[in-house]
């Protein structure tokens, strides 16, 4: 619950975290960031919150200039519509801004739109394991599977964000 009780408090808390981190020389590359990644997942059973994306994006751009923003909202970088390692064929790096809503179809995100009115790179995210977190009983994907993912993302012109979770000792295994 992030130690807040209302949407208003949550949105203020989130904005304050952005203000603390962005442009601060203690973080990033001497205070410079190239991308802010805003995951839209809330987890099962989580309360629905109406986020103040406009305020957050305004601050992010003020603090970091031409930074790329990954979000479920109409931004410069969009979710590709799945976490399985498959980008659309073809995939377009444009979308129609009005179509990027909470109800957007994953297939639309996966392919983009050749007639789109805004540039939005489809960024692919996938974990090297079957889940996002490390578990002793899970094995990493095989080289064959990773190569297949690579060709179906990067080979189709889509940046790949590969999650490699650390184990309990903090090592990447």
Describe the function of each predicted region.
Residues 1-173:
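Mature catalytic domains of secreted/periplasmic carbohydrate-active enzymes
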